A protein has these predicted regions:
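Membrane-penetrating hydrophobic segments
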Residues: 1-15
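An N-terminal hydrophobic leader/cap segment in hydrolases
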Residues: 13-80
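A short loop-to-beta-strand scaffold at the N-terminal edge of the catalytic core in hydrolase folds
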Residues: 83-94
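Histidine-centered divalent metal-coordination motifs
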Residues: 89, 106-107, 138
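Short beta-strand element of the alpha/beta-hydrolase
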Residues: 99-107
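Serine-hydrolase catalytic-loop signature spanning alpha/beta hydrolases and amidase-signature enzymes
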Residues: 107-118, 130
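Catalytic nucleophile-loop/oxyanion-hole region of alpha/beta-hydrolase
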Residues: 112, 136-152
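Conserved alpha/beta-hydrolase
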Residues: 122-142
Length: 152
């Protein structure tokens, strides 16, 4: 093999190594941001945003109040142990004479009462029993990372 071919092969190998390391690092950062229990520092200020409302304090306060009202309603706190031993929590609201059951999974880095406080009344008024699940790695459920319901 000529010197020129060796240099080209070395350059290509070095480039591939740098690209691989960069891809690994970026992927790790993105996965950690998406799945880790703790919210990244740069996202702390987004915690109180409600879709379409910006940071309107009245809307945020109203949604939080509805969440507190939902939590205060009669319900049963439930817990299961996943196949990997992690304890997962939920909140069962039974509607006598229900016609359907809703399993409600809160959004990314949120909570059941924050996401469903404003719409829970609709479910119950329409003859639904509802299980508000707490995602793995969030709130009272165990685990170090979110599973988005895929591993439960």
């Amino acid at each position: 093999m000529s010197k020129k071919a060796l240099k080209a092969a070395g350059f290509l190998a070095g480039t591939a190594a740098v690209a691989g390391a960069a891809a690994f690092t970026v992927t790790k950062i993105l996965v950690d941001t998406a799945l880790d229990r703790d919210m990244p520092r740069v996202m702390k200020n987004s915690d109180n945003l409600i879709s379409g409302s910006g940071t309107d304090p009245e809307k945020i306060e109203s949604a939080l109040k509805k969440g507190d009202e939902l939590e205060a309603m009669p319900h049963e706190d439930v817990e299961i142990t996943a196949a990997d031993g992690i304890k997962l929590k939920g909140h069962w609201y039974h509607k006598e004479g229900d016609k359907r059951v809703v399993i409600a999974m809160h959004g990314w880095r949120s909570s059941w009462k924050k996401d469903f406080g404003t719409c829970a009344e609709f479910f119950l008024e329409n003859d639904c029993s509802v299980l508000f699940a707490e995602q793995r790695g969030q709130n009272s459920s165990g685990g170090d990372s979110m599973g988005f319901g895929l591993v439960e």
